[in-house]
């Protein structure tokens, strides 16, 4: 059996339905207004922080009937670590969504975001002294080639654009590419920081990390206050959509945005639950299948351009990622313990 148990079908369903619906709703928003990236990011962060807040509350039973909140769960990870993670997380999230404002096609956007293996290996080998097997190096080469093929297939035809007087399209695409590259490396750095943090404080800290990383990011959106207010007005002015079951009508962009933020939370929770209940191989396989389905839906439903070169790049990225997940453990050369590690180990011995 590929799946470890029938219980894993629940998070798999959450990933397939939640993540695919999230991509569809995002593309529906971007089709109507390409400049909605910041508003979408803000509502995603606010929604996840709000829902996660209730997961992090400590409850006390009263009279064997009622439960009352008595405060937040004890936070194990220090604030300075969260500040570092939040800063990186906020910047990469904004970069990923803002890249969609720069003529980056949704299928290419999904493929590129699936290729973080490249930056993870580069950063891991340079800063964390990790060594990789031949199969892992081969996986890296495949992913790199996949990125190159996908990039060339998605680039605007410069000769055609110049002849039409649309030179900015190629420039915008290049800016979007730089945003995605920066976000890819930041994502890998964040992943390695989280991996190190979970080693120190326990792997069961994900509910805490989700809450604080989104909550502490919200003040940063004050930098984009005018942009957010402008797009809230655009949402209010969008065409009305008839709601099912006789609930009247509601502005279309608000409907898409609500669906987007709710499905993103379902998607995130599905990934976390699946990671805890199945093997890394199963998790990687499910996520890769989900991303491939999202690309197919984007191409068919939204009539996005999908060349043979882009298809080849897609296969190389997913196959390379799958090979890497089956290649065994990465060998880490021991680093000298930091002051923080020494303090934690000393505390464990005393307890």
Curated annotation (Swiss-Prot):
Q: What is this protein called?
A: UDP-N-acetylglucosamine transporter slc35b4
Spell out where the chain crosses the membrane. Answer: 6-26, 37-57, 77-97, 104-124, 136-156, 173-193, 209-229, 252-274, 282-302, 306-326
Record's Gene Ontology CC terms? endoplasmic reticulum membrane; Golgi membrane
What function is annotated for this protein? Sugar transporter that specifically mediates the transport of UDP-N-acetylglucosamine (UDP-GlcNAc) from cytosol into Golgi.
Origin, by domain of life?
Answer: Eukaryota
Where is this gene product found?
Answer: Golgi apparatus membrane
Q: Mind listing the GO biological process terms from this record?
A: UDP-N-acetylglucosamine transmembrane transport
Coiled coil spans: none
Keyword entries, A-Z: Golgi apparatus, Membrane, Sugar transport, Transmembrane, Transmembrane helix, Transport
- Its chief place of residence is Golgi
Regarding the membrane, this protein is recorded as: Multi-pass membrane protein
Recorded name of the encoding gene: slc35b4
* Molecular function per GO: UDP-N-acetylglucosamine transmembrane transporter activity; UDP-xylose transmembrane transporter activity
Pfam family name, one: UAA
Family the entry assigns: Belongs to the nucleotide-sugar transporter family. SLC35B subfamily.
């Amino acid at each position: 059996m590929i799946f470890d148990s029938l219980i894993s079908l629940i998070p798999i369903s959450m990933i397939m339905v939640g993540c695919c619906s999230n991509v569809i709703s995002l593309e529906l928003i971007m089709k109507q207004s390409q400049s909605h990236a910041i508003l979408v990011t803000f509502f995603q962060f606010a929604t996840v922080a709000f829902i996660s807040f209730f997961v992090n509350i400590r409850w006390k039973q009263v009279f064997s009937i009622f439960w009352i909140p008595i405060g937040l769960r004890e936070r194990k990870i220090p604030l300075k670590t969260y500040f570092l993670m939040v800063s990186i997380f906020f910047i990469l999230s904004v970069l990923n969504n803002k890249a969609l404002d720069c003529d980056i096609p949704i299928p290419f956007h999904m493929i590129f975001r699936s290729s973080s293996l490249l930056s993870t290996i580069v950063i891991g080998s340079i800063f964390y002294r990790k060594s990789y097997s031949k199969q892992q190096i081969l996986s890296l080469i495949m992913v790199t080639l996949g990125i190159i093929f996908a990039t060339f297939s998605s680039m605007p035809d410069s000769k055609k654009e110049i002849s039409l007087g649309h030179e900015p399209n190629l420039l915008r695409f290049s800016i979007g590419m730089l945003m995605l590259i920066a976000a890819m490396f930041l994502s890998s750095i964040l992943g390695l920081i989280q991996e190190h943090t979970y080693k120190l404080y326990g792997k069961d800290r994900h509910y805490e990390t989700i809450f604080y990383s989104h909550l502490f990011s919200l003040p940063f959106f004050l930098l984009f206050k005018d942009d957010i207010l402008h797009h809230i007005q655009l949402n209010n002015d969008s065409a009305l959509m008839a709601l099912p079951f006789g609930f009247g009508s509601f502005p279309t962009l608000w409907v898409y945005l609500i669906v987007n933020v709710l499905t993103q939370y379902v998607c995130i929770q599905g990934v976390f639950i699946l990671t805890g209940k199945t093997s890394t191989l199963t998790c990687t396989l499910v996520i890769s299948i989900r991303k491939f389905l999202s690309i197919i839906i984007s191409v068919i439903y939204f009539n996005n351009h999908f060349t043979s070169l882009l298809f080849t790049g897609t296969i190389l990225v997913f196959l390379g990622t799958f090979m890497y997940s089956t290649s065994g453990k990465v060998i880490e050369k021991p680093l000298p313990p930091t002051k923080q590690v020494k303090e934690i180990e000393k505390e464990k011995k005393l307890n």
